[in-house]
A protein has these predicted regions:
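Proline/Glycine/Serine-rich low-complexity intrinsically disordered segments
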Residues: 1-134
Length: 134
């Protein structure tokens, strides 16, 4: 379904904001920016917005799985335009700190191999946050 003529709420300065302004605004989508996500949810619930565009995990856990979000749902496919949204979430390290990078990579590999990662993730998420295909 087209978003043309719709009002979409977005947190200003985010990658979603950049994407929406580049891809949707030229197609007659009204982009409404906010300082924080609570303001977006308030306007969505009160009918001042048709949709919101944000991080899927945040939307699911901070809104859709709450009482005020129970009448809303995800729509459309995930947006994965690496030109704007990048390639996922990462950890920032000091450039050239190869030892720390190696220790972190080894620790992540170890907990994924021994099942610790899966146990922790299952406690908090209903999907694999590491990005493994289901």
């Amino acid at each position: 379904a087209s978003l043309a003529g719709k009002r979409v709420g977005i947190i200003q300065g985010t990658t979603q904001d950049m994407y929406a302004k580049a891809e949707w605004a030229p197609k007659s989508v009204t982009i409404v920016t906010y300082q924080n996500q609570d303001q977006v949810y308030q306007d969505l619930v009160n009918g001042r917005l048709d949709a919101t565009f944000q991080d899927k995990t945040q939307a699911g856990y901070s809104f859709l799985k709450t009482e005020r979000g129970k009448h809303f749902a995800f729509a459309g496919d995930d947006i994965t335009d690496s030109r704007i949204t990048g390639f996922g979430v990462a950890m920032g390290l000091r450039k050239g700190d190869a030892a720390l990078k190696s220790r972190l990579n080894d620790a992540i590999a170890a907990i994924r191999a021994n099942g610790t990662y899966q146990k922790i993730a299952a406690k908090y998420f209903d999907f694999d946050i590491y990005g493994a295909k289901q």
